[in-house]
């Protein structure tokens, strides 16, 4: 079996590693560097450039250079135009992967066909699928997609030999942020919770400096540079350099001569001092966002900062002193610094590749799904099948039914999110199961199965248990959650929890009432002489009362009338059951030991159908 490449496909930089002699080794690229800028461009002569060479020519050729494409993975309508050709994020990412693959092959002297690629823990299904597709386009069989914080913990835990540790992994990369809580012990790496923001990273810190420089230049020179792409590229490069320098010094000078020309043709230069204190002040809200995610992850894991044994920082942006201070103050632990934050994820990916290839033994990786998955049911309710932070791979099935008599099909509306109301969540996909035989509502049994594979990619199927007819969908729909959508899902779930609970309870109360009315009317038709006229009259009156209550909006009134109908129908149902039992015994001829009693019925939830 050939080498399996471990790849950290980053927003700003990418890194690769393989297992050699039982150890994960970082592979340098063709230029000799251990990381490769995630930049793609085309020279003015039409030559494709990837990595450092693409980054170097960006200032003079910004319109044909692409940065931070990872931020757009999974977006359906996002295209990048290079040399007149429209490219998807998958295609741009594939160009980066192709360079990594070629450089690894040159270094190892053998062909690379397979890879393990990492993604942010908070990447949704569409973003994960897009990453896998990029690998396929690059000529790689992607054996596994794993979360970056989990990969970093593998890099940390492989040679430590310690057991039963709770680890917080804080991953602030170029364009994404994740925090994960893991328990490590006995070779098992189990993710307990994860939280984050797929649109927060070092790029955002750079942009704050760029905005500051633009404002200062406009204030002193009266010139707006925000529309000049070449100037913006120079400012972005200078901002990144200043950010890095401020990790080691208290103040830095940003000097960009001949930045532009004034109305009189005179050259204009930029010369500004920036202190670490100024930089931290202009970015404190970004750091606060990461603090919110840390609190969320600990809450989901049902832990406190005191329960954390070790803290790992990964991603180049964690070199900023303010980040280190924030994490240390929150957890009360000094971050573990014996891992290169730029290389830890690739090393972990290589270790996972070693597990898959049989080179690494006695390691079990248990990752989680970041958001709740479910379907829409009658009344617009979001019915969860797989809660967030469930260990993957996982499979869950639940029985649903029809919402109307003689319903020929059901639509399965697949959702992702934390709200109790379907319309407040993210739609992942829809599909229809046809060919359901005519039957009263609630009778057909439709088994809906959610299956999340080890890559975190969801597959959904629906099966009519009566006919065996089945329909399925792999959720590979392009498009994904924005950072605002992800943050809104968690925050809205907390802010509107009581409102959702009441709305859900009201819908369920109505559903139960309508179901009981149908059952009661059916029972009356089948009762025959088992029920007295007085009993039938009471049931009909109770049905009328409940129908009238359903015309209003008083949930308590509906509940009361539902209970009244249950009490009215109970004597008839009991008498019918006893009669059926007597007939069954007579049909059995009194044979000893023989029974025809039914087993317990399965709970059926009505599925919404459009």
From Swiss-Prot:
The keyword Nucleotide-binding applies. InterPro entries: ATPase_NBD (IPR043129), Chaperone_DnaK (IPR012725), Heat_shock_70_CS (IPR018181), HSP70_C_sf (IPR029048), HSP70_peptide-bd_sf (IPR029047), Hsp_70_fam (IPR013126). Keywords: ATP-binding, Chaperone, Nucleotide-binding. PROSITE patterns: HSP70_1, HSP70_2, HSP70_3. The keyword DNA-binding does not apply. CDD domains: ASKHA_NBD_HSP70_DnaK-like (cd10234). It holds the Pfam family HSP70. Acts as a chaperone. This is Chaperone protein DnaK. It comes from Methanosarcina thermophila.
């Amino acid at each position: 079996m050939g080498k399996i490449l471990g790849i950290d496909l980053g927003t700003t930089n990418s890194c690769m590693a393989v297992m050699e002699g039982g150890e994960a080794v970082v592979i340098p690229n063709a230029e000799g560097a251990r990381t490769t800028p995630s930049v793609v461009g085309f020279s003015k002569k039409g030559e494709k450039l990837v990595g450092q060479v693409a980054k170097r020519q960006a200032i003079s050729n910004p319109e044909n250079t692409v940065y931070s494409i990872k931020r757009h993975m999974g977006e359906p309508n996002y295209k990048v135009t290079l040399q007149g050709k429209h490219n998807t994020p998958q295609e741009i990412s594939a160009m980066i992967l192709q360079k990594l693959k070629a450089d690894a092959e040159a270094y190892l002297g053998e062909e690379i066909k397979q890879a393990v690629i990492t993604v942010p823990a908070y990447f949704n299904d569409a973003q994960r699928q897009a990453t896998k597709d990029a690998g396929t386009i690059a000529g790689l069989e992607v054996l596994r997609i794993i979360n970056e914080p989990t990969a970093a913990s593998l890099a940390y835990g492989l040679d430590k030999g310690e057991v039963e540790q709770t680890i917080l992994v804080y991953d602030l990369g170029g364009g994404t942020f994740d925090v994960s809580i893991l328990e490590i012990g006995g070779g098992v790496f189990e993710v307990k919770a994860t939280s984050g923001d797929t649109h927060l990273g070092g790029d955002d810190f750079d942009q704050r400096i760029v905005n500051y420089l633009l404002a200062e230049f406009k204030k002193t020179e009266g010139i707006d540079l925000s529309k000049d792409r070449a100037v913006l590229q120079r400012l972005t490069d200078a901002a990144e350099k200043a950010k890095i320098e401020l990790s080691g010094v208290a103040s830095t000078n940003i000097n960009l001569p001949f930045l532009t020309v004034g109305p009189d043709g005179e050259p204009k230069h930029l010369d500004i001092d920036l202190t670490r204190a100024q930089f931290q002040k202009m970015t404190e809200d970004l750091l606060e966002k990461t603090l919110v995610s840390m609190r969320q992850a600990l809450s989901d894991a049902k832990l406190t900062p005191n329960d954390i044994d070790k803290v790992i920082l990964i991603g180049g942006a964690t070199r900023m002193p303010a980040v280190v201070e924030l994490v240390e103050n929150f957890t009360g632990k000094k971050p573990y610094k014996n891992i290169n934050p730029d290389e830890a994820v690739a090393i972990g990916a290589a270790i996972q590749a070693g597990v898959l290839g049989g080179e690494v033994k006695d390691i079990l990786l248990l990752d989680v799904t970041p958001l709740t998955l479910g379907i829409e049911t009658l009344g617009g309710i979001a019915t969860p099948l797989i809660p967030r932070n469930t260990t993957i791979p996982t499979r869950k099935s639940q029985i649903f039914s029809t919402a109307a008599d003689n319903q020929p099909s059901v639509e399965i509306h697949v959702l992702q999110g934390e709200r109790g109301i379907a319309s407040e969540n993210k739609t992942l996909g829809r599909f229809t199961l046809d060919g359901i035989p005519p039957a009263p509502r609630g009778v057909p049994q439709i088994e809906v199965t959610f299956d999340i594979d080890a890559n975190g990619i969801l597959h959904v199927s629906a099966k009519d248990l009566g006919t065996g007819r089945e329909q399925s969908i792999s959720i590979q729909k392009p498009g994904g959650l924005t950072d605002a959508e992800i943050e809104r899902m968690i925050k809205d779930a907390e802010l509107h929890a009581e409102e959702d609970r009441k709305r859900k309870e009201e819908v369920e109360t109505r559903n139960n009432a309508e179901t009981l009315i149908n059952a009661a009317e059916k029972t009356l038709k089948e009762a025959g002489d088992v029920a007295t006229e007085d009993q039938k009259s009471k049931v009909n009156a109770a049905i009328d009362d409940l129908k009238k209550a359903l015309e209003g909006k008083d949930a308590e009134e509906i509940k009361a009338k539902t209970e009244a109908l249950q009490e009215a129908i109970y004597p008839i149902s009991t008498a019918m059951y006893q009669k059926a039992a007597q007939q069954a015994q007579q049909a059995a001829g009194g044979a000893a030991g023989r029974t025809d009693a039914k087993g317990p019925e399965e709970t059926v939830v009505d599925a919404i159908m459009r």
